[in-house]
Amino acid sequence: MVYIDNIAAQEVLDSRGNPTVKATVILSDGTVASAIVPSGASTGKREALELRDGDDRFGGKGVLKACENVEVAIADELVGLSPYNQAEIDAIMKELDGTNNYSKLGANAVLGVSMAVARAAAKSLHMPLYRYLGGANGVIVPTPMLNIINGGAHADNDVDLQEYMIMPTGFDSFKEALRASAEIYHTLKKLLAEDGHPTALGDEGGFAPNFKNNEEPIEYILKAIEKAGYKPADEVNIALDAASSEFYKDGKYELKGDNKVLSAEELAEFYADLVAKYPIVSLEDGMAEDDWEGWKILTEKLGDKIQLVGDDLFVTNKTILAEGIEKGIANAILIKPNQIGSVSETMQTVRLAQRNGYNCVMSHRSGESEDAFIADFAVALNTAQIKTGAPARGERTAKYNRLLEIERDLLYPEYIGKELF
């Protein structure tokens, strides 16, 4: 019987130069597999807790305590167990932690081990990760949301909305869709440069210049789509991540880029005007995570027109999602494994969403690494959508390149962008 022989952890750097956990699992058959945990910038209040050292190293952001928890507390419980029972492994770590948000061991410690165990098990069985986790059902190569203009907490500019994304929905393959997206990205860079805008990049590889308001980035993206030779709405649509918790103050929404302070009703109307004017098919975190009344207003106004994605709202938590489903809040959920803390819990949330007709969008974090786990995970769970940044910066393209490999390797890959909306 193959069993877990050893578990190790190392402090490594993410794409923002901050420390994160790399966990390595060694099996008795000699299989070695590792996983690197991502980290977010705009985080929901109810996310699972990253354990940081809080000392002088790395401005308090070191993760040596989390690494120690992997090598001592977690390893003591898991060494000797079969790696092929993911649910059991994750349940043991959850019980060992004993809190509802992994504040004892750290979600960065637990998730690192959870991912590494899954990868080791797949490798030991000579299976690709997506096939190991998804079985024969994992056939949909997800339609990407590519964040090509960054604002909010992801950039040092005066744009309030955090992400302006393109969705290449009108193509027959992921390969074609990614090519179109890259061409649009490069065209956008030229357009910005021609107008005297700096083309510095934000955390997720998108451009981050200043604009006169929150609508101007959409105009630039539409120009780039057309100039690159593609058709807005027919081939390429627009998705937004407002990350509105970041500009929610005292029950109001402060849009500094537009010099406006809006109520939830007024903000919903602001979005409705954008949706009527532009080919916007998806809006993430349109209201603040604590403003459930605002979410109800937004869902009633736009829920039958576009995809309304809860990120900070649901934090990949099945209990919170169940409450949202019961109250008719949003119609889609962003899936970030490090928000909930383990592979198994992520899968449970996805299954709940899919059973109730909520779309799922697999997602990276702004602090990423070369680890492409979520690419396989998206295919395994048939999320049909993935959000992993611009077609630039190695930690972003690692996911896209892995999806290209998966599409090539699948016997009958499905790219269903045309059917999403």
Swiss-Prot record:
Binding site for Mg(2+): 241, 284, 311
Catalytic activity: (2R)-2-phosphoglycerate = phosphoenolpyruvate + H2O
Cofactor note: Binds a second Mg(2+) ion via substrate during catalysis.
One Pfam entry name: Enolase_N
BP-aspect Gene Ontology terms: glycolytic process
HAMAP family: Enolase (MF_00318)
Protein name: Enolase
Record organism: Nitratiruptor sp. (strain SB155-2)
